[in-house]
């Protein structure tokens, strides 16, 4: 499985599942559990139980969202739906795609922050001093150059829950390479398994001249990793309540792909499921129809309370 680049972007040769599982380049694909590196690195006394009496489970929890596109924003959308104060930061020079931002921006606030600017960087560090959770979704090394590695964050605030995600894992030679769902699907053998031959109408690997690679019908690695990140954040917060210590969870699209391959294949008939609960909210993007979160709190459906805000409309401050 060769690593090549085009205009600075990584490309992957289409891989089969055996090649993916035996390839040493993606060191993080098989490292530890789905959320690796979850050992507690901070220190402190048990936290007081101030959240339980609030309306939602994560009310009063402050989350700094340093993520983009799908996986990370899905994670912080879950945390926001559970009541956390989520402030998403984006670089002014690289605006997010409107559709992705609107889809994952419910219940959050949005601000722009140029970490290369000394004044802005200092303000972000002030926010970090009172944050409970940081979710970071940039490639390896991107935030480290601004002094925002998980180790530095925990040293500055020992009770912090830090969740990081990237494309190719946190060890190995690809740890600092950009990775996206579709590319990881191809490299992991998913595109090979889901390939089709129009002439035979058969799915699966096929050497015929009309065979074409396929893909999952959704960005499954992104969404699965996002929900995994949210679960990791909640787990770290739960540990902090009893120990006072923060910690780090590291996830990646590659590790999620490996997790999917480890699950048994099910050939049973797919059962019909009920349509998800849909709602509508007015927003600066127009009227939005959306699926409510797949979350239940004390037997009640968790619903989004606020539409996505205008992009970059919030102050660099907690609510």
Where are these regions (language model features)?
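Acyl-CoA thioester-binding alpha/beta core of soluble enzymes
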Residues: 1-93, 121, 125-133, 152-169, ...
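PLP-dependent aminotransferase-like
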Residues: 78-116
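Short, solvent-exposed loop/turn segments at the edges of secondary structure
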Residues: 99, 105-108, 157, 177-179, ...
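Short beta-alpha connecting loops at secondary-structure transitions
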Residues: 108, 215-218
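Rossmann-like NAD(P)-binding element
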Residues: 108-144
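Hydrophobic alpha-helical scaffolding
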Residues: 114, 133, 173, 177-180, ...
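N-terminal Rossmann-like NAD(P) cofactor-binding subdomain of oxidoreductases
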Residues: 117, 136-195
């Amino acid at each position: 499985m060769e690593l090549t680049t085009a205009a600075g972007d990584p490309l992957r040769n289409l891989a089969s599942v055996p090649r993916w599982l035996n390839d040493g380049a993606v060191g993080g694909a098989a490292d530890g559990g789905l959320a690796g590196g979850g050992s507690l690195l901070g220190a402190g006394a048990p936290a007081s139980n101030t959240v339980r009496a609030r309306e939602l489970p994560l009310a009063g929890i402050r989350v700094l969202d340093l993520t983009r596109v799908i996986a990370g924003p899905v994670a912080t959308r879950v945390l926001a739906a559970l009541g956390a104060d989520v402030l998403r930061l984006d670089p002014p020079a690289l605006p997010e795609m409107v559709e992705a931002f609107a889809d994952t921006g419910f219940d959050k606030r949005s601000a722009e922050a140029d970490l290369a600017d000394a004044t802005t960087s200092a303000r972000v560090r002030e926010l970090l001093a009172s944050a409970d959770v940081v979710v970071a979704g940039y490639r390896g090394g991107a935030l480290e150059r601004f002094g925002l590695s998980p180790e530095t964050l925990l040293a500055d605030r020992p009770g912090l829950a830090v969740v990081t995600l990237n494309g190719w894992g946190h060890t190995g030679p690809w740890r600092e390479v950009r990775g996206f769902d579709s590319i990881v699907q191809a490299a992991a053998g998913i595109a090979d398994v889901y390939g089709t031959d129009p002439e035979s109408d058969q799915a699966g690997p096929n050497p015929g001249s009309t065979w074409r690679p396929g893909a999952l019908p959704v960005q499954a690695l992104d969404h699965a990793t996002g929900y995994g990140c949210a679960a990791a954040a909640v787990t770290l917060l739960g540990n902090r309540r009893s120990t006072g210590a923060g910690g780090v969870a590291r996830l990646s699209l590659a590790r999620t792909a490996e997790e999917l391959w480890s699950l048994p294949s099910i050939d049973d008939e797919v059962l019909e499921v009920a349509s998800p609960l849909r709602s509508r909210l007015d927003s600066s993007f127009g009227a939005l129809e959306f699926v409510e979160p797949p979350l239940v709190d004390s037997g009640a459906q968790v619903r989004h309370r606020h539409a996505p805000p205008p992009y970059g409309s919030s102050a660099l401050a907690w609510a």
